[in-house]
Amino acid sequence: MVWAWQQWLSPRPQKRTKNTSQVAFYTSENAALYEPLSKPDGNWYVRETHFRENPNVRAGLTGPPLHLHLQQDEYFKVEQGVLGAVKDGVEVAITKNDPVLHIPRGTRHRFWPHPSSTEDLVFTAWADPCKDHDHILDLNFLRNLAGYLADCDSEGLQPSPFQLILFFHEASSILCPPFLNWMPLWLLIWVHNGLAWIAREFLG
């Protein structure tokens, strides 16, 4: 049972979309398509397609907020269009002619469809390590996050910061919103863990 004060502090959709059985799944308003794929060695990667006809894609709003991963390196390879990215405060625009973008663990970063692109953005992304570890960025995290955001959007709700922090915490990742991004990493981790504990223990 969800109490009124929990709903007030952390609004949640009344209906949750089940996307675990879907081979591929869409984000809010079908702005982007996630296609989980497998490598010959059994590791996974994701092909993301961000559709330029969607106004949120043209505005560069379909990427994640600034964040970092504590246990994994992350990699991006563009197949079509232009990917914008920030890596430790340095902004770049990447095309298929550029090498793989490597984001070492602990690096603050974000990515989005770059406004200079004139076509759909298509890129692949993967993390290392990507299996045999608990509490890492994996396909369950991507499905849960995409489904939650889409459900919030369909019901006209603002996503709960506490829920987002808990999602990232369970994937050994840290959100870096502006009011926290000034912190050194050790303090940011401490605050993030505290907020995730509140979300898990008190907000249901």
UniProtKB/Swiss-Prot annotation:
Name the Gene3D superfamilies for this protein: Jelly Rolls (2.60.120.10)
Pathway involvement?
Answer: Secondary metabolite biosynthesis
Against InterPro entries, the record matches this protein to: RmlC-like_jellyroll, RmlC_Cupin_sf
Q: Is this entry keyworded Oxidoreductase?
A: yes
The EC number(s) given in the record are 1.-.-.-
Q: Does the keyword Oxidoreductase apply?
A: yes
Gene Ontology MF: a single term: oxidoreductase activity
Keyword annotations for this protein, in alphabetical order, are: Oxidoreductase
The UniProt Biotechnology section states that this protein is used in the following way, namely: Iso-A82775C is a precursor for the biosynthesis of the anticancer natural products chloropestolides A to E via a Diesls-Alder reaction with maldoxin. In the absence of the prenyltransferase iacE, siccayne accumulates instead of iso-A82775C and can also be condensed with maldoxin to produce chloropestolides H to K, which show also antibacterial and anticancer properties.
Listed SUPFAM superfamilies: RmlC-like cupins
Phenotype reported upon loss of the gene: Abolishes the production of iso-A82775C, but accumulates pestalodiol E.
Signal peptide range:
none
Q: What class of enzyme is it?
A: oxidoreductase
Q: Please report what switches on or represses expression of this protein.
A: Expression is co-regulated with the other genes from the iso-A82775C biosynthesis cluster and probably controlled by the cluster-specific transcription factors iacI and iacK.
Per its database record, what is this protein's job? Answer: Oxidoreductase; part of the gene cluster that mediates the biosynthesis of iso-A82775C, a enylepoxycyclohexane and biosynthetic precursor of the chloropestolide anticancer natural products. Within the cluster, the prenyltransferase iacE prenylates siccayne to generate pestalodiol E, using dimethylallyl diphosphate (DMAPP) as cosubstrate. The probable oxidoreductase iacF is then involved in the epoxidation of pestalodiol F to pestalodiol F, which is further converted to pestalofone A by the short-chain dehydrogenase/reductase iacG.
Q: Which family does it belong to?
A: Belongs to the oxidoreductase OpS7 family.
Name listed for the protein in its UniProt record: Oxidoreductase iacF
